[in-house]
């Protein structure tokens, strides 16, 4: 039976060459939908001379791959750097471009908005952003379903940067904002049950759990050890991959490192990524000499090699939403030590494929890493169980569920 071809508009706050887990996920989604024969219209941030020059030179998959499909079209909306993070974009206000006009010309069956909150301006406390919920005006005028695809736990970011006292004051009004914002969409998809429960308590309307945040389990695989970036270095390796930002708690890895090294003297911490804290992290790492390597960004087979080579993948962030790199490490056969936070318990099962540490507790985090590295039998067992534990989140399996839900939403809208 031939599947019906859908016309799908995807509006995203981040896309290649801007580097983030969101951008990677959006491109994978676009590619999979194109491969199924759907018509995809991607509305993405433009890259311009306001951004650091190295962004344009990143060897990441993006438009060039999508443009090879005849069923693909795109529009780059005007953007500017995020106030406190110049390597990520924010859309210009709707006075400068019109999502309703773009969508009306394409005539989609359904619209997906990836990172809707960020595009609205939540990251910049509304000093930047589109000025209204993206896609909401088109939805009101046409009745075409518009879906918000949740990626970033903005509430966790607010708590992290403002602290508990100010955050608790904001809790009086946050549910009002979240309720009003979520009502602009037919449904908000959450890839984490814990995140969905958290936002439902904050009055998020029409929320729905859908395991759409998959990874390519064929690409991320233990056999990628053949791409080991440092094959002559036989020290036990703990690996972090991600943006080097405050909310990722990268500094806490440097707090935990000497505690780990006291028990595992030849341990090697490798930090892969870039971000605003680059200089600070490099400065702090100097005291540990060759014990810590700040690798910078990594792409392609080199990155695959890092995931497969690592003995333990570490993630101290308390702001993750079903973290992609956690899953990529597990698919590569590498146990994960993360902290207790919404969604991490859905990825890491203590004693099965890794351990969960107390948040913001470098000593407990170090002890969890040490427990793995000083016990070869335990490490082997965790590594053996890591990949099977995450196969249900293979990209194709997740996208088939996602596609099925899109069909349901389109069919329901046509009956109205």
Task: Pin down the residues of each PLM region.
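Donor nucleotide-sugar binding/catalytic pocket of nucleotide-sugar-dependent glycosyltransferases
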Residues: 168-224, 233
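Nucleotide-activated donor-binding/catalytic signature segment of Leloir-type glycosyltransferases, i.e.
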Residues: 279-298
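Aromatic "clamp/platform" in nucleotide-sugar-dependent glycosyltransferases that forms part
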Residues: 318
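Conserved donor-binding/catalytic core segment of Leloir-type glycosyltransferases
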Residues: 189, 229-258, 270
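N-terminal subdomain of nucleotide-sugar transferases
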Residues: 1-62
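A short, well-ordered alpha-helix in the C-terminal region of glycosyltransferases
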Residues: 364, 371, 378-392, 404
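Short hydrophobic beta-strand element within catalytic cores of glycosyltransferases
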Residues: 335-338
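Conserved acidic donor-binding segment of nucleotide-sugar-dependent glycosyltransferases
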Residues: 350-351, 355-362, 371-376
């Amino acid at each position: 039976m031939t599947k019906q071809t859908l016309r799908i508009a995807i509006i995203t706050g981040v896309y290649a060459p801007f580097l983030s887990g969101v951008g990677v996920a959006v491109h994978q989604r676009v590619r999979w939908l194109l491969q199924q024969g759907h018509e995809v219209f991607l509305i993405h941030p433009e890259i311009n001379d306001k951004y650091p020059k190295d962004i344009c030179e990143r060897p990441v998959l993006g438009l060039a791959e999508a443009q090879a499909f005849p069923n693909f079209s795109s529009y780059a909306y005007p953007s500017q750097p995020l106030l406190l993070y110049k390597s990520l974009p924010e859309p210009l206000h709707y006075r400068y471009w019109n999502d309703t006009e773009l969508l009306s010309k394409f005539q989609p069956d359904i619209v997906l908005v990836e990172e809707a909150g960020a595009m609205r301006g939540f990251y910049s406390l509304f000093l930047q952003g589109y000025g209204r919920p993206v896609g909401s005006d088109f939805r009101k005028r046409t009745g075409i379903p518009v879906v918000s695809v949740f990626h970033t736990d903005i509430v966790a970011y607010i708590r992290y940067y403002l602290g508990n006292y100010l955050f608790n004051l904001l809790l009086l009004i946050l549910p009002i904002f979240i309720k009003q914002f979520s009502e602009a969409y037919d449904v908000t998809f959450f890839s984490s049950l814990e995140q969905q429960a958290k936002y439902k308590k904050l009055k998020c309307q029409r929320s729905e759990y859908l395991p759409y945040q998959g990874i390519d389990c064929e690409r991320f695989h233990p056999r990628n050890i053949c791409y080991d970036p440092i094959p002559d270095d036989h020290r036990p390796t703990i690996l972090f991959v991600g943006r080097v930002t405050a909310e990722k708690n990268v500094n806490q890895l440097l707090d935990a490192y000497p505690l780990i090294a006291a028990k595992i003297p030849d341990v090697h911490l490798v930090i892969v990524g870039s971000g605003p804290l680059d200089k600070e992290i490099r400065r702090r790492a100097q005291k540990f000499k060759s014990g810590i390597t700040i690798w910078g960004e990594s792409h392609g087979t080199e990155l695959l090699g890092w995931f497969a080579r690592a003995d333990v993948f570490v993630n101290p962030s308390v702001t993750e939403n079903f973290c992609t790199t956690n899953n990529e490490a597990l698919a590569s056969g590498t146990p994960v030590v993360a902290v207790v936070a919404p969604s991490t318990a859905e990825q890491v099962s203590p004693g099965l494929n890794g351990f969960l540490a107390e948040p913001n507790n470098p000593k407990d985090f170090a002890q969890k890493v040490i427990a793995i590295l000083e016990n070869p039998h335990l490490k082997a067992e965790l590594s053996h169980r890591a990949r099977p534990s995450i196969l249900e989140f293979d990209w194709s399996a997740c996208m088939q569920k996602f596609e099925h839900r899109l069909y349901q939403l389109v069919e329901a809208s046509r009956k109205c």
